[in-house]
């Protein structure tokens, strides 16, 4: 089993000789992937899954083909199971959340709700 984690940049202020240095942003705008130990359920083998080229990934959904959906700076990005970007829903705003429905993918941005008529289906978490 594999677990995905989206990490937001952490802003740090460092004091050096009484002066506040510029903020450092750690880590990158990326999603991490882990292996999950089937016995202990602990996460191991952390590695970068995918990078966002616009904004910070926020929210995560998976479809039945293993594709990963995440809200980013310009809309929703879609990566295949290997972490290659395969599509974007351009909304010209930051996506806050995505939800698979029987009618498609419901996308919520900062002010509006969109329904994308797509063939992909969300995974059934009750099966896990």
Which residue stretches match the model-derived regions?
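Blade-edge beta-strand/turn elements of extracellular beta-propeller
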Residues: 1-4, 35-53, 78-91
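Beta-rich, blade/repeat-based domains predominating
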Residues: 1-23, 51-73, 92-104, 108
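Short loop/turn segments immediately following the C-termini of beta-strands
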Residues: 16, 24-27, 36, 73, ...
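A detector of repeated loop/turn-to-beta-strand junctions in beta-rich toroidal repeat architectures
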Residues: 28-30, 43
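WD40 beta-propeller blade core
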Residues: 32, 77-78, 114
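Short loop/turn segments immediately following beta-strands, especially the blade-tip
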Residues: 34-41, 117-125
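Short glycine/proline-enriched turn or capping motifs at secondary-structure junctions
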Residues: 101, 105-123
């Amino acid at each position: 089993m594999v677990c995905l984690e989206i990490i937001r940049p952490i802003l740090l202020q460092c004091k050096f000789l009484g002066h506040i240095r510029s903020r450092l942003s750690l880590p990158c705008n990326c999603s991490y992937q882990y292996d999950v130990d089937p016995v202990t359920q602990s996460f191991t083998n952390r590695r970068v899954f995918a990078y966002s080229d616009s904004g910070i990934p926020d929210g995560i959904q998976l479809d039945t083909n293993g594709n990963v959906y995440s809200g980013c700076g310009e809309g929703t990005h879609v990566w295949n199971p290997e972490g290659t970007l395969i599509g974007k829903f351009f909304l010209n705003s930051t996506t806050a959340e995505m939800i698979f429905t029987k009618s498609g993918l419901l996308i919520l941005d900062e002010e509006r709700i969109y329904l994308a008529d797509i063939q992909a289906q969300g995974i059934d978490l009750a099966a896990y």
